[in-house]
């Protein structure tokens, strides 16, 4: 059917048919995860007693916003948290993580990155090198930073973690890959890092950046030893519907502590109006398990198709998936730009736009991005990006439905490797 809508070369169509056949077993596996998570989501809604009245938000201060409180109750049930902040005021994943870090850390405390250097945009938050200099970084507030690089095989250095965690206040784990070519960490790895830390420092706070990982498995990192998780609602948990916002969830005492940085000291979680955002946030969250499944299926298909083209993606399509991201070395500026152009041209919004490399806040290299999304910056909708530095690695994520995701991917592959 796809050839009725797109001018695809015979050799590309043959690879498409082969990829679909090879992916059947993996598709069935992630559909099983979807079904479990959707039933868990349904029970979260029914057990919390969500009513139509909860779709109406508040204005002004947002004091006594029962609808906001109900949303946070539902989210807690979904991720196994004691408490949560689910708020439209969080502008991005980086902003959400920043609020959490500044809420947890005080002058003289130490932040330890246990899984290597964090994502590029967090370098400015922490104050690594010249990033964020003069902007009020953690380091400028007297908070120490240390990190444990990953081993050569991209696995955690548990001995290094044990040595450095003894004096750490907060231990940061980044579940997804950032701009590195490693697999997302599974829950067993997160659990082992947490156990390693607690053996030498029981009081350390285990903080997991959960961006891109929500609902890819049947459990979340709070069940694997994390104390706090954080992420963005324009990624997985928003289901491609929620237009903005983020979440911080976990231990009640820690969420309370963070809430005073989210608003102001002495005010905490009681303030924060929701205006007209609640219906879309409830709806996006409800649909998230199914949408995440479609994104993972798009990733599996892309990985298989790329392998058939002689490209080596991470992860492989046969591996377990713990985020929605696929990365691969395109090998050249032309291939990277060609793949991004193919994704952009076959996206529902701004399909006529040609992606061009540009400077982006928080990044040291020019970055090329393709995103024809309904929500600006959404990465649960299909998008791809990559820094313009050798080996010109491309990062593909999202796809709110597999049919459209497949169309974008196959056209991008043809554009990059069969031009």
Feature roles, as predicted:
Residues 88, 249, 330:
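Conserved residues at beta->alpha junctions
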Residues 82-86, 109-112, 169-170, 204-206, ...:
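Structural motif
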Residues 55-85:
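Active-site-flanking structural segment that lines cofactor/substrate pockets
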Residues 307-419:
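Conserved C-terminal alpha-helix-loop-beta "cap" of PLP-dependent enzymes
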């Amino acid at each position: 059917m796809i050839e009725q809508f797109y001018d695809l070369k015979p050799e590309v169509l043959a690879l498409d048919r082969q990829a679909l056949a090879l992916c059947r077993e993996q598709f069935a596996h992630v559909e099983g995860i979807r079904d479990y998570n959707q039933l868990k989501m349904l029970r979260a809604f029914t057990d919390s007693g969500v009513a139509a009245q909860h779709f109406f938000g508040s204005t002004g201060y947002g004091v006594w916003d029962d609808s906001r409180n109900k949303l946070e109750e539902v989210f807690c049930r979904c991720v196994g948290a004691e408490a949560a902040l689910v708020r439209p005021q969080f502008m991005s994943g980086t902003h959400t993580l920043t609020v959490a870090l500044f809420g947890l850390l005080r002058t003289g405390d130490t932040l330890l990155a246990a899984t290597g250097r964090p994502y590029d945009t967090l370098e400015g938050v922490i104050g690594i090198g010249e990033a964020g200099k003069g902007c009020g970084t953690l380091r400028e507030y007297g908070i120490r930073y240390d990190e444990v690089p990953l081993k050569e095989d991209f696995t955690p250095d548990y001995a290094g973690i044990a040595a450095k965690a003894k004096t750490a206040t907060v231990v940061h784990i980044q579940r997804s890959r950032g701009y590195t070519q490693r697999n997302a960490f599974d829950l067993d790895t997160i659990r082992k890092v947490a156990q390693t830390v607690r053996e030498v420092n029981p009081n350390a706070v285990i903080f997991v950046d959960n961006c891109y990982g929500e609902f890819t498995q049947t459990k979340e990192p709070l069940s694997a030893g994390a104390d706090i998780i954080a992420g963005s609602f324009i990624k997985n948990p928003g289901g491609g519907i929620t237009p903005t916002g983020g979440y911080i969830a976990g231990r009640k005492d820690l969420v309370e502590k963070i809430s005073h940085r989210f608003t102001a000291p002495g005010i905490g979680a009681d303030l924060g109006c929701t205006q007209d955002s609640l219906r879309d946030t409830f709806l996006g969250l409800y649909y998230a398990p199914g949408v995440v499944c479609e994104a993972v299926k798009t990733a599996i298909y892309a990985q298989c198709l790329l392998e058939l083209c002689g490209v080596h993606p991470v992860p492989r399509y046969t591996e377990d998936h713990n985020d929605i991201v696929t990365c691969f070395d395109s090998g050249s500026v032309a291939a990277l730009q060609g793949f991004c152009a193919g994704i952009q041209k076959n996206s529902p919004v701004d399909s006529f736009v040609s992606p061009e490399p540009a400077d982006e806040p928080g990044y040291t290299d020019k970055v090329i991005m393709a995103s024809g999304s309904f929500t600006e910056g959404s990465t649960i909708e299909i998008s791809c990006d990559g820094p313009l530095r050798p080996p010109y690695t491309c990062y593909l994520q999202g796809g709110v439905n597999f049919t459209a995701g497949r169309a974008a991917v196959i056209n991008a592959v043809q554009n990059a490797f069969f031009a």
